Amino acid sequence: MGDVEKGKKVFVQKCAQCHTVENGGKHKVGPNLWGLFGRKTGQAPGFSYTDANKSKGIVWBEZTLMEYLENPKKYIPGTKMIFAGIKKKGERADLIAYLKSATS
């Protein structure tokens, strides 16, 4: 498992421009991530997803996020997430640790 504090820095640098994490937070370019773990792709209430996200049908957990965050467009072809991904596994683990603590 990753380091929550390092993960928060990764989130601020690479994710916060498009995503919020707090309960009741607004959608930005990307959906609010509150309740992410255990939720199916394309299911954040009130966010307009692509058909690709809605039909992917996986449940977000450490394993699926680890793969998705490495290369989002490869994992969900047709996603509108315009982010190249995080190549370093340790950095992804830190981000996932932060997301797990911040979104539930």
Curated annotation (Swiss-Prot):
| Sites of N-acetylglycine modification | 2
Role description: Electron carrier protein. The oxidized form of the cytochrome c heme group can accept an electron from the heme group of the cytochrome c1 subunit of cytochrome reductase. Cytochrome c then transfers this electron to the cytochrome oxidase complex, the final protein carrier in the mitochondrial electron-transport chain.
Keyword Cell membrane attributed: no
Record GO cellular component, one term: mitochondrial intermembrane space
Concerning PTM, the database record says: Binds 1 heme c group covalently per subunit.
UniProtKB keywords: Acetylation, Electron transport, Heme, Iron, Metal-binding, Mitochondrion, Respiratory chain, Transport
Q: Which residues bind heme c?
A: 15, 18-19, 81
The transmembrane segments are none
**Can you name the source organism?**
Cyprinus carpio
Query: Is Mitochondrion given among the entry's keywords?
Result: yes
Q: What GO molecular function annotations does the UniProt record carry, in alphabetical order?
A: electron transfer activity; heme binding; metal ion binding
Q: What is its main location?
A: mitochondrion
Q: Give the note.
A: The protein was obtained from food carp that consisted of two cross-bred strains, the European carp and the Amur carp. The isocytochromes may be the result of strain differences. The sequence shown is the iso-1 cytochrome c.
This protein's source sits in the domain of life called: Eukaryota
Gene this chain is encoded by: cyc
InterPro entries registered for this protein in UniProt: Cyt_c-like_dom (IPR009056), Cyt_c-like_dom_sf (IPR036909), Cyt_c_1A/1B (IPR002327)
Name assigned to this protein: Cytochrome c iso-1/iso-2
> Where does this one sit in the cell?
Mitochondrion intermembrane space
Classification via SUPFAM superfamilies = Cytochrome c (SSF46626)
Family label: Belongs to the cytochrome c family.
